[in-house]
Amino acid sequence: MARLRDSRSPSPAGSLSARKRKDDDRRDRDRRDGPVDHRRRSRSPIDRRYRDRDRDRGRDGRDRDSYRRRDRSIDRRDDDYYRGSRRDGDRRRSRDRGLDRLRSPDRRRDRSRDPDREYRPRRDDSRDRARVRREGTAESSSHRRDDVRARDQPKPGNTTAKENEPAKSTPTQPQTEAEKKAERLRKLQAMKQKHALKEAKEADVTAGLTRKLFMEMDQRASGAVVGSGTNSPAPASPAAAESPASPAPYVGKFDPKAIARNAKPARASSPVRLGDVKLGDVKVGAPVAAAASIAGQGKGAASGKAGLLQTGRPISTFGFNKSADALKTTAKRKIDMGDEEIIKRKLVKLPDLALENADDTPYADDDVAEDAEKDFDVLLAGTEEDRAEAQRLLRERREEQIQKESMAMEIDSAPSNIEVATEPVAQNPTAMDVDDEVDPLDAFMAGLEQTASGEESHSKADTLTEKKNGNIPPEAYFSDDDYGYEADGTDPTSILAMASKKKKKDIPTIDYSKLDLNPIRKNFWVEPYELSHMSEEELAELRLELDGIKVSGKNIPKPVQKWSQCGLTRPILDTIESLGFEKPTPIQMQALPVIMSGRDVIGVAKTGSGKTMAFALPMLRHVKDQDPVTGDDGAIALIMTPTRELCTQIYSDLQPFAKALKLRVVAAYGGNAIKDQIAELKRGAEIIVATPGRLIDLLAANGGRVTNLKRATYLVLDEADRMFDMGFEPQVMKIFNNVRPDRQTILFSATMPRIIDALTKKVLRDPVEITVGGRSVVAPEITQIVEVMDEGKKFNRLLELLGELYADDDDVRSLIFVERQEKADDLLRELLRRGYGCMSIHGGKDQEDRNSTISDFKKGVCPILIATSIAARGLDVKQLKLVINYDAPNHLEDYVHRAGRTGRAGNTGTAVTFITEEQENCASGIAKALEQSGQPVPDRLNEMRKAWKEKVKAGKAKDASGFGGKGLEKLDKDREAARMRERKTHKAEGEEDDVKEDAPAEDGEKKDKTKVAIQSAVSAIVSRDASKAETEDKHAIPAGAVKAGHHASSGKSGGALDKAASAISEINARLARAGQLRPGQPIDNKGPDAGAFHATLEINDFPQKARWAVTNRTNVAKILEATGTSITTKGNYYAPGKEPGPGQEPKLYILIEGDTEVVVGNALSELTRLLREGTMAAADAESRAPASGRYTIT
C-alpha cells in the first residue's frame, strides 16, 4: 500500500544518499512491474474512515495493532526494523508527498508483525461487505468521527443535482385520509407517552417498573427488528434477517433508547434506519415497523433486486427524527427558492418541544451536504417508474413530517393547509440538465427575498400569485430576520430621499424643553457710585458730547467714562492696559454697561470706532462665569462674521485676552482644511469665531457629534446688516434655531438700513438699540473726494494720486477697490508694470493667499492692495491713509464701509471715488453719504442724482438698495439643475432610469418657453393656391397641429363663408401667378423648384446655436435626402428688440417646399426638433458657464 502523504513513519537508518538511491530504484521498479490495482491505488478516505470506526468500536488488540501499524503511525518506532534509525521526516515526506504508488510485490518484506498484511485485498472485500451490513445502524452513525463525516460529505455545488436525481422504488399504496389521521393520533399519543416516561425517569422510578415497561413494549412490537445497540461490538445476528417481512404496526410508547437497548443486534445487507419508508404498504411515519419490514427484505436487496430504497443514512444521536428533519429542511429550502409561493410571516409563541421532535433548522447549514447525499441515495437506482414512485414517497414523507410538526407545535387550533412546493419529477431522469442546478448563493439570496413582510414588500408577481392562490397561512418569523431595513433598501424613492437628506447638511435639531439645562448668569453690571448720582440732564449732555449717542429701550444703564467702571476682572484690565487702550470709545462707553447687564443689543457706530472690543470684553466676563468646557461640550460664545478676513481679524484681536484668561478660541471659516478645525473643536473651545457656511458644516458633520450649541449662551453677529441679508439669512436662522432660548444676542454694524430691522428684531428679546454718529454715516475724520470722469482717464488719475501719496511718506498704505475680480488682476498687472509694489485680493483666490496678502499689507511688505468689496468690512490697517474707489460702489452701505477703511480710531484719511457718466445709479448713494457726513456734493454728481431719480419715477429704471437676493439655497438649486442637465447630456446608454424624473421647475419652465417659441415660429402647411386669410387662420391653430392647405378648387362650398374664401383664394392665386409679391406673403419662391405645398419656420429670435442647427449644410442635406423637399433660408437677421421696417425684408426664416403635404410635414417636424434641441443646448451652456471664466470660488 502506498505511503500516505501525512505519514509520520520514521526513516530507516543508514546514509541518506544511499537511501535516496534505493528509493529511486524502488520507484522505477514500481512503475515497471507493479500490479495495477485501482482500488488499492485509491487514496480515498473511505478505508481510513472504516478503520477509525472499527478502532472506536473496540476491536480486539490484534486487529487494532495491525490497523495502527498499517497507518504507519509513530508507534512503529518500537519495531526491530526501525531500531537505531534516525528520523528524517520532513525530507522523506517532502520527497514522497503526492506520490500515490504501490510497492512491488517482490519487494514485500516481513518487517511487520501483521500476518494479515499480505491478504489486504481479501480483507478489504470482507470489510466492504461488512460495511454494507453495518451502515445505517445506530452505532455506525453515533461513533463516526466528525472529521470522517466531513470527508464523506459531497461538495456543496452538487447538492441540488443529487436531490433532483430520481431513485429506485417499488410501487406502494397511498394512504387514505382516515389512515393518515389515525397515524397522526398514534404519533401524538406516542409522544405524550414518551414525555410521561421521561418524567417518570426523572422521578427515579424503580428499575423493575422500567424493565416491565420495556417488556411490554417488546411484546407490542411483536418481534420487530431494530438496529443493534450503540455500544455492542458483537457481529450482526443471522437470525435477524429471518424476521417477518410485514410485522404488525407498532402502537405502543415510542422510546428509541429503550428499543435500541432491548432489540436484537440484527443487520440487513441493505442499510436501513428508523424513520425510513417501506416500499410496500407500510404507512409513512411508522419508524419501527418500517425498519422491521425493510430488514426482512434485506436478502432480496443483496441478491440484486432493485425493489428497495437505498437509504443508507446514519441515525442522529439527537433523535430518530433527524433524517426527517433534514428532509424537511431541504423541502423548506425548495419552498424558499420557488417562484409561485408567498410566505406571510407573523409572530407566534414558541412551543416547548421534546428533544426527538426538535427542529434542526438552525443547524441545516451544517448538514446540507449530508442531506443531499441521503436524497441522492434514495433516488439512485431502479427503473424510471421506480424513481417516480420514490419521488412521490419522498414528497409524501416530507408532507407528513410538516404536518406532524404543525400538530406538535399547535400553531393554530384550525387545521393547517400548508402546501409544500416540491420539485416536479424529471421527465428524463437519466439526462440531467446541469444548467438547471441552483447556485447556493442564488438559493440563499432567494430565501432572503422572501423575508420581507407587509404589503409594501410584495412585488407585482407576488400580488398576482396571492390573488390566484388565495389566502396562505402565515408563517412565524423571528427576531433575527430584519425585514424593515430590507424593505426600505429596495425602494428607490427611499434611497433617493436618504441621499438627498444626507447631502442637505441638516443640523440635528435640539428640543431644549426636554433638556435639564444649568441656569446661566447674564447680569454682571453694578452701577458705579459716580454714575448713580448723575441726573437726566447731565446724562443727556454726556451722551451728546460722546458723538451724539442715541439709545432706545427701557431701563438703559448709563454710559461709563473709564475702564475701571466696567466691572471687568483684573486680567482683562491688565491686558487692556498692555494694548495701549487709554479710555473707551463712545460706542464702548454705552455698549459695555448694557451688554454687562445681560440685555440684547443692536449697536450701530461708525467705522473704526472699536465695536469689536465693545462686544468682546463682556463676552470674556460671561464665559469665565460659567463652568469649564469639558468632553463633548460645545462653545459658550459664538461670533459670526460675513467674510473670512473679518473672521481672522477678530480671532487675532481675541488672542491676547484668551491667553491671559486661559481660554481657547477657534476660527472656523471656509477655504481652510476642515479637518484641522474639527481637531481643534474636539480638544474643546470656549469661543468660536466662524462664518455661517463653515459653522453649518461643522454642526452637521458626523451627525452633529463634532460640536454642538447646547452651551452657547452668548451670540454675536458682526456686520449684522449683511448677516441678515437674504444671502445669509437662511443659514443664520438655521443656527439661531439650534441655540438655547435664554441666550444673549449682540448685533453690531456700521450700517443698519431699515430694511434689515424687521429681520433683526425677530431674534432679539427686548433689545436696546445704540446708535453712535448716525446710521450709515462716514466718519468725519475722512476726507471724501468724488470725481466724475471717463473710463479711459481713471488709470492716469490713479497713478497721479499714488505719486502724490508716496512722494511725501513711504510708510503709508493705500487700498484700491474695484468691482470685479478680472478688473483687480488687470489693474494689478498694470501697476506692476509702472513699478508699484502691490497685491490683489478677491473671492477667486485661495484662502491661504488671501490671509498672507492681508498680513503682508498690514506689515507693509506691499503698500498697495487691490481688492473687491470682500475687504470693505472689518479690515483694520493702522497706516491706511488713502482709499480709492476705482469702480464706484452701487449702494450707500458699500460706500460707507469702503471709505471707512481709512480714518480709523481717530486718525485722518482720504477717500477718493471715480464715477463715470453712465453710473447714474451710483450717484444717488454717494451724494447721500456726502450730505450725511456734512461734506459738499459736486454739481455734476448732483445732476446725475437728479437724472437718476427722474428715471426711477418714470419707471425707466429701478432703484436698488444693495440688499436682498435669493440666498445660498437658490445657488444650490441652480447647481443641482446644472448637474442634472449635464448628466442628461452625457449619460451613457441604459442610464435613463438613473436620472431624476422630477427635474427642477426651472427646466420645465425653460422647456415650456422653448416649446411656445417654436410653436409661434412654425407655420401651417399650405398649398400654393391657398389664400392669405386661410394661412392666418392656420397660424391661429395651436402649435404642433400640422394641417394641410387645400386648393381652392378642391374645397366644397358650404355656405357664404366658403364662397367668400374661395373667391379670395382665386384672387390671390391670380396675383401670385402674375408675380406680384405683396409684403408678408408667405410664399416667395417662384422658381421651377417651387412645390405645391410649403411651410415656414421663423428662426430669427432663437439663439445662434439653434439657428446653426437648422441651417448648417450637414443637417439640411440629411433632411433633403430623407424627404425630397426644398429648404431655403429667407429674410434678414434682426437683433433682439428690433423689428423690420416697412418695405424691409422679413425676419430670418426657413421656407420648406414639397410636392406633397406629407413630405413637407416630415421636413418641418425634423427642423422643429433640431431647433428645439439647439435652443435647449444653448440654455444649458449658458447656465453651466461660470460668472467668471477664470476663478473657482472655494
UniProtKB/Swiss-Prot annotation:
The keyword Ribosomal protein does not apply. PROSITE patterns: DEAD_ATP_HELICASE, HELICASE_ATP_BIND_1, HELICASE_CTER, Q_MOTIF. Residues 232-248 have a biased composition (Low complexity). GO terms for cellular component: nucleus. Belongs to the DEAD box helicase family. DDX46/PRP5 subfamily. InterPro entries: DEAD/DEAH_box_helicase_dom, Helicase_ATP-bd, Helicase_C-like, P-loop_NTPase, PRP5/DDX46/KHDC4_KH, RNA-helicase_DEAD-box_CS, RNA_helicase_DEAD_Q_motif. A motif (DEAD box) lies at residues 718-721. It comes from Neurospora crassa (strain ATCC 24698 / 74-OR23-1A / CBS 708.71 / DSM 1257 / FGSC 987). GO terms for biological process: mRNA splicing, via spliceosome. Residues 592-770 form the Helicase ATP-binding domain. Keywords: ATP-binding, Helicase, Hydrolase, mRNA processing, mRNA splicing, Nucleotide-binding, Nucleus. ATP-dependent RNA helicase involved spliceosome assembly and in nuclear splicing. Catalyzes an ATP-dependent conformational change of U2 snRNP. Bridges U1 and U2 snRNPs and enables stable U2 snRNP association with intron RNA. A motif (Q motif) lies at residues 561-589. This is Pre-mRNA-processing ATP-dependent RNA helicase prp-5. It catalyses: ATP + H2O = ADP + phosphate + H(+). The keyword Nucleotide-binding applies. It is found in: Nucleus. The Q motif is unique to and characteristic of the DEAD box family of RNA helicases and controls ATP binding and hydrolysis.
